[in-house]
Amino acid sequence: MEPPAISQQSTPTAPGGTQGTRKLRESCISCSRSKVKCNKEKPTCSRCVRRGLPCEYMVSRRTGRTRVIGVEQPKTAPSPTTPTNTTAATTATKAGPPVTTDSAVHTPVITTAPSPKPVQIQSPPAEPDLWGAILSPNTSTSTDLSSLLSVNTNFSQLFASLSPSLLEGMDGMDAEMHAPELGALSVADPSSSMMQGLEAPNAAQPPSSNTTSHSYCLSICLDTLMRLFPNAGANCERPGHESNPGKLFTIESVIEDNKQILDTAQTILACRCAEDEYVVTLVSLIVFKVLGWYVAAARDRSSDPGREEDFNWSTAQDSRRGSVSSFEEQVLHLPTVVGSYCIDGHHQSRMAAQLVLSELYRVQRLVTQVSRRLESIRRRSSSSSSSASSNTTDSDGGMSTPLSSTTLVHLEDDLRKRLRAVSSETISILRHA
């Protein structure tokens, strides 16, 4: 059987006057109607030969972007000066709604081959590679900058406040480009010391408060110790420091804060970080300061003349800045409600001392845990010192640990003495109330 004259249908005249080859369907009409695979032999497939069917290949309707022969400009020719009739001829061959000549005249030349280039802006390959190189751990830089890690601030909170401020200033395209990079910054590893210089000048700083998102015990100890000195900067005369009047705290706030602080210190002592003498020493200082706040809450200072007059009720500040030390525990002894107790009148001193005495068992439990940690450190220090002295011929008298065993023994003794003194004073207040 003779095949149909397909060549006449598949070689139409192009707009430029030259003939172009039009694409045929890969499957013939008979195989397409039967939903079977065609072997694509031209002019007649093997299936049509076996069945004696006419084999015809239709012109494909989904030709995509038709390449016009003879119209394509060389690479060196400038593209902005494309004629309007060429644009109209190119758009006429595209599948979709018909485009008139008037609309093509008023439309910029964006239908030619360079048109897909703006889409590539959404995923630039250079930016992610650049940020990946900066944020990836580098052995050469990590060793050089490891000494700066101890002074780094909270990077996760810094970039969490940094990312939204930058995202708000972007348009739609920039936000689509840089959103993955900013997301990587907000969750990047805080140990990367190179991130400390990435702060934007207009970024909002994290609010300064007593709480922090640091999760390691040493930082929690330092933050807790600063929390116990709320008026430390009241009398500071360092150049450039703006001192503020000291604040007073109620008995209720002292009791509640000390509960939280003692619970925090107990969790620190249960961690392996407490095997270090610095951490245990900081916990001991926290216990000393907590006992100071307890005894300040138990003492009756209602007889102090002018104490209530010097207190500013609107700002909760004490105007007697020069008369008291900024490191002294100052508790406001005024009628107040603590838990289910109402402290007022002649019952004030007795109820305050009774509340403090009922909380001292927490301190006793913490002092016992501190003593165990100090004893473990002393044993480890003595064993390391004995092994070092046996291995060296000349003894220079140096210590294997920063704090000697004698210092740790005195620290434990002072903790117990301070606890006994606060308990005795609180009991004395109860007896004379």
From Swiss-Prot:
Record's keyword annotation contains Cell inner membrane: no
Keywords: DNA-binding, Metal-binding, Nucleus, Transcription, Transcription regulation, Zinc
Free-text disruption phenotype from the record: Imeairs expression of the sterigmatocystin cluster genes.
Portion annotated as DNA-binding: 28-55
Protein name, UniProt field: Sterigmatocystin biosynthesis regulatory protein
Skewed-composition ranges (Low complexity): 76-101
Annotated GO biological process: aflatoxin biosynthetic process; asperthecin biosynthetic process; positive regulation of asperthecin biosynthetic process; positive regulation of DNA-templated transcription; positive regulation of secondary metabolite biosynthetic process; positive regulation of sterigmatocystin biosynthetic process; positive regulation of transcription by RNA polymerase II; sterigmatocystin biosynthetic process
Pfam families, per database record: AflR (PF08493), Zn_clus (PF00172)
InterPro entries: AflR (IPR013700), OAF3 (IPR050675), Zn2-C6_fun-type_DNA-bd_sf (IPR036864), Zn2Cys6_DnaBD (IPR001138)
Gene Ontology molecular function: DNA-binding transcription factor activity; DNA-binding transcription factor activity, RNA polymerase II-specific; sequence-specific DNA binding; zinc ion binding
GO cellular component, one term: nucleus
Pathway entry: Mycotoxin biosynthesis; sterigmatocystin biosynthesis [regulation]
SUPFAM superfamilies according to UniProt: Zn2/Cys6 DNA-binding domain
Extent of Polar residues compositional bias: 1-13
Organism encoding this protein: Emericella nidulans (strain FGSC A4 / ATCC 38163 / CBS 112.46 / NRRL 194 / M139) (Aspergillus nidulans)
Positions of region (Disordered): 1-23, 73-102, 378-404
Main location: nucleus
Compartments, record wording: Nucleus
CDD domains: GAL4
